[in-house]
Amino acid sequence: MLFRSGGLLQGIGMTLYEDVWYNEKGVNLSNSLMQYKIPTRLDFDKIRVEFESSYEPTGPFGAKSIGEIVINTPAPAIAQAVYNATGVWVNELPITPEKILKGMHVI
């Protein structure tokens, strides 16, 4: 499962978890996995991944790259889902409950 959905999980992590914090002197405060959150296998159940057959005439033997593409797709999909559910556009990552509540003028 992981080898088929790893890029997708990375994209979800980038969208919902990953954030870099710096102090006023520019020192990275999130330089370990204690502060820099990423998802683990325990955060997700099974994800169904399907491949569509196609032919790319410029690729080797008709192949296409898929590794990097899947990282970019969760962010707009999740942002759209948040907007559909709440009416709030979150336009910077990560998308957090705090940002959604601020957009709803709750906090």
Predicted regions and their residues:
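C-terminal catalytic domains of large/alpha subunits in multi-subunit enzymes
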Residues: 3-107
